[in-house]
Amino acid sequence: MGPQKLLNLIGNTPLMETVNLVKNKNVKLLLKLEGNNPGGSVKDRAAYNMIAAALERGDIKKGDKLIEATSGNTGIALAMIAQLFQIEIELVLPEDSTKERTQTMRAYGATVILTPASEGIIGSRDYADKKVAQGGYLMLNQFANDDNWKAHYKTTGPEIWNDTEGTVTHFVSAMGTTGTIIGTSTYLKEKNKNIQIIGAQPSDGSQIPGIRKWPQEYLPKIFDASKVDTVVDVSEEEAREMTKRLALEEGIFAGMSSGGSVAVALKIAEKLESGVIVAVICDRGDRYLSSDLFD
């Protein structure tokens, strides 16, 4: 394969078989390595699809200014792709987001607005909504944009199906905007309705960057409960521990949301006699080096 343009490098990420985490040799645990996307996370897929579709429809025009609330990875992906299309963008995120994330967004030319940490991503969403209501901004709104989940219907789902040669039995994904799990589920269920779709969310009181147990009034509009067979709570401690185990036992340096997903996947693996479980590794661990995750 010869040289590729950056946007053509989004997707087709590796699917890696773990070798140490699962003791039952009749159960395969496969990791979808989304940190291999050019922007470093699974969010490259949705960001590209949302911007490209909006441009094609004429929803975004030259000179427009975008604003978006994000916990980090979507913001980085949007900043990267917006600059390719020469679109101005402001990104709103909680002030306790890691320095690596905010600096990366600024490196891509985005304006970064920080909202109080105590308000979390909900505070960032409220701020962005108010700015749009005041005029002068357009919002892609990843939480309500069908082009978010459709990115995974078009790419992530088919990749998993093809790479497992149709043998996948379980799919596990952390739930933030829920675009990854809804889009991938929609495709996989069309191929085999018996594939189990499992969402990972933080247990009460746990803080896991990138995923959230949403209050009903803030539940992403793209979420479709019929597409998810089971939602499993994972504690912050479990997610931290598994994130460290991924690095030490499998050589995968990832963020805490990935640890949460794999912790849930491993619980499922321990109950199965046989199966093929695919879990999403959302991003890379280098986005969290200024936090205490790897202390």
Which positions does each model-derived feature cover?
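PLP-dependent amino-acid enzyme catalytic core
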Residues: 1-295
